[in-house]
Amino acid sequence: MTQDITIVYYTSNTENEAFEEKIRQILFSDSQGVPIISVSQKPISLGDNICVGEVGRSSYNQWRQLQIGVQAAKSKYIALAESDFLYSKEHFAFIPVDEDVFYAPLRVYQLCTMKNRVHKFIPMHKRFREGTSIVGREYLLMALESMLGKETWKPGIESPRNMLPHLFHERNSVLYHNSVPVVTFRTDAGMHQHIHDDHPNGIDEIPYWGTVEDVKKAYL
């Protein structure tokens, strides 16, 4: 495992606190000693915490918080971590080859847990996988600086057409094979409510994590 990497965890603290605390606990366990910088809107206990205050949630503020964490890191590589993702020890043991590439795992599933929706594991499209990225620090900072404006914060969830481009947009990116899938939740408290819960490839069970009900019981 390369030690020249920092996990940057960023959150608006709007998910259910008990749920997010479970996410943080397993993240800390799976990090296996990799340094963590957390950037939050309320104080949390995870690595070196930077609390920016309750600036509101939006895609703009999400990337600003990430930028603040990346600027504070000193490592060559950054592993992104979000407050509604389940990663694994395998994920944080990945060793990047190049600094100017966004590396993301091939097997990533969304689990919708919203009311009145079908609860299944749904394969996640490549362009939505920023929260699984491992990338060179300088390349990531360049991407963020090109997206963000002069305003420090812009609260308020944007409409889909007004959201900032995805980090992968027109960037070098590579998908790599992972044996343990990464899981991201779509909850009623989440910023992104859009999900195709009628996806023809939705499944009820995935390796390592188990069934939909297993995961819901463990984390929700």
Question: Where do the model's predicted regions map?
Answer:
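N-proximal low-complexity "stem/linker" segments adjacent to membrane-targeting elements
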Residues: 1-22
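A generic structural signal for alpha->beta connector loops
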Residues: 4, 33-34, 46
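Short loop/turn segments at strand-loop or loop-helix junctions that form parts
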Residues: 8-12, 40-42, 51-54, 105-107
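Short, acidic, metal-binding catalytic loop of nucleotide-sugar glycosyltransferases
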Residues: 21-34
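Active-site-proximal specificity loops/subdomain of glycosyltransferases
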Residues: 38-74, 91-93
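Short aromatic/hydrophobic "clamp" motif used to bind/position activated sugar donors
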Residues: 78
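The conserved acidic donor/metal-binding loop of glycosyltransferases
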Residues: 82-86
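Conserved catalytic core of nucleotide-sugar-dependent glycosyltransferases
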Residues: 92-212, 216-219
